[in-house]
C-alpha cells in the first residue's frame, strides 16, 4: 500500500461527453506537470463494472485499460456480475488498497442504492475521487460523470422510425431498467420526436437489470393481444435481438422496424439481413479513451 501525500481532490466536478464532438475534455498532453517522484509512482485506478454480459462493456473495458496504461496508470478491473452488494464490496476493496481513483459502472437494478452512495462517501472520505462512468449514481456527489448525450440517442432512434414508417404506425417500447439513469433520458429524446409524428407508442415494457430475454417475452406477449406491430424500440441491441426472435416465430421478422443502440456485431448482421432497421453507434472507444485521460487528471488534482 502507498502512503498518501495529502492531495486535495476536486469534488463536485461534472462532465458530459456528447455524441457530437465529445467536448469539454482535456487530452493527455494537458496532464498537469508532476515531479520525478510522482512520475515514478504509477496512478492506481480501480474500476468496477456492472457485468460483461452486454458486448459493449467488454469494448469499454479493453479500450479504457489500454488508454490508461498508455498514460502510465495501472488498472484493477472488477466485475460485479449484476450484484449491487458485490459492487459495494469491490469499492471497499479499492478503498482498502488505497487506489488513486475509483471508476464505477453502476449496477442497474432495483436494489436499494443507499449502500452504493455510502460507499462513494467512504471513498471520498479516504481521499479517493469517484468517477461515474456512463451511468450516473443518483444522489451521490461523484467527482466526475462521463457519458454520451442519451437524449440524442433517443432522438436518432425515433427519427429513423419516422422515416421508415412515414405513414404512421403503432409501436412497442422495450426499454432498459429505470434504475439506469440513461433509460429515461433515451425515452425523453424518443418521445420528443414522436410528439410531432403519426407514430403511437402502444405499450412500454422494461428489461429489469438489462435482461435481454425481455425483448422476446415482451414482444411475444404484445403480439398475443395486439396481433401486429409496426415498430419495436429496444433499449439496446441485445434486447433487439430477442425481439427479432419473437417476431421470427410469428413470421414477422423483416416486416417490423426494430431499432436499438450500441452497434453490436450481431445487430449489424441483422441490419444486413433486414431484420433490424438501425442501431445507434456510440463511439465507446473515444469515450473510454477520453475517460481514461480525464480520470488520470482527476487523480492528480
What is each residue range found by the language model?
Residues 3-6, 25-301:
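A residue-level marker of the well-folded mature domains of exported/periplasmic proteins
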